[in-house]
């Protein structure tokens, strides 16, 4: 209502705002419907049936790709660990040249005559001296005495002193960083080889670590070190082989070396019964005799004659006990050429 010039009120209709609002709303909805993308075929049916339409996430919980983002990365598989020098099978793709001994104890071998960096440098130089004589790459190696035969029974009465994993870990880790292989040597006394091997499971889970059994220092009940040459039955070796093969397989490691030291035939009883059926394990017979070249050659002939066909062989040179110690050329002249050569 408005007021006229005469002062009288004149009836002029006001706008009907409810009707205007309804009209505008209807117009907006019609425009939105005209611009909308039609749903894909089957979407309406899916909606009425309760099944997920093409734009719904599957019931399996698969990730939904949001526009403007990348698809989830596919899971990647870590590369299989390899041996020092490459590959996952030991021989015939390499030759090992090793320093033998115990860290910090010079009396037990040349490995203990210098500190860790010095031992790496010495092993590397020694391996290099064989490179011109070898038809395969030469890998510097540590053969570390992990358990040492003792003249005293010790707290557990087994006449064997066991190194801790923590004390050996730096030698293993730094050897790996230098591209070296490591063999843990067991001198069990009255203990059994398998029980001692299990002590070093954490180290044997590493791809550059193998194992050596030294029957010379395996004692029967009532025996003491140095009173006789010890020995072990093939069945006891087979128990270690089976356990180590299982560990290697379950942790997807490359083939592991299992060294058997020998300089008398009696050191490995029933040698023909050695279990060679585990592809995860490469056995190697290591001739450990010392003395004159003629005496060592005689021992070599006896050991090689009794070794199961096809097993690789090793040779040990002694700086003090050999008279004289063979040169690399003389060492490699043996047939078959040794695939592991240790220095003590």
Model-derived segments and their meaning:
Residues 2-39:
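Secretory targeting and sorting signals
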Residues 89-92, 124-137, 172-177, 200-208, ...:
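Acidic (Asp/Glu)-rich catalytic clusters
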Residues 95-101, 140-144, 182-186, 207-213, ...:
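Hydrophobic faces of well-ordered beta-strands that scaffold small-molecule active sites
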